[in-house]
């Protein structure tokens, strides 16, 4: 089963978690908030900030994820791209994501 790491578990982000599960992914959510609804839907939850690149990297590496998604979260987009690049996963180029964040 493929694994996907989703950065954030807020109510808005549960849409992506549910969609990934429906597509057959093992879902892993990381969020620094201890009681977001996504953690109750995901297959696994980590209490880590979605902007902490090193924490995200360690989780993604440990879990052997096939992809990283920052859905409905501008602050998590760049960390997702940086970590995906480091792990050789499909992603938008981190430099492009960084530039797009300068809005």
Name each region found by the language model.
Residues 1-96:
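ATP-binding N-terminal substructure of ATP-dependent carboxylate-amine bond-forming enzymes
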Residues 96-103:
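Short beta-strand to alpha-helix junction loop
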């Amino acid at each position: 089963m493929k694994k996907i790491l989703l950065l954030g578990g807020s109510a808005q982000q549960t849409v992506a978690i549910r969609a990934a599960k429906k597509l057959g992914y093992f879902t892993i959510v990381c969020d620094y908030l201890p009681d977001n609804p996504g953690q109750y839907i995901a297959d696994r939850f980590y209490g880590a900030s979605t902007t902490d690149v090193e924490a995200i990297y360690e989780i993604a590496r440990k879990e052997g994820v096939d992809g990283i998604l920052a859905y409905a979260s501008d602050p998590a987009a760049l960390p997702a791209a940086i970590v995906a690049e480091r792990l050789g996963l499909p992603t938008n180029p981190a430099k492009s994501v960084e530039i797009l964040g300068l809005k």
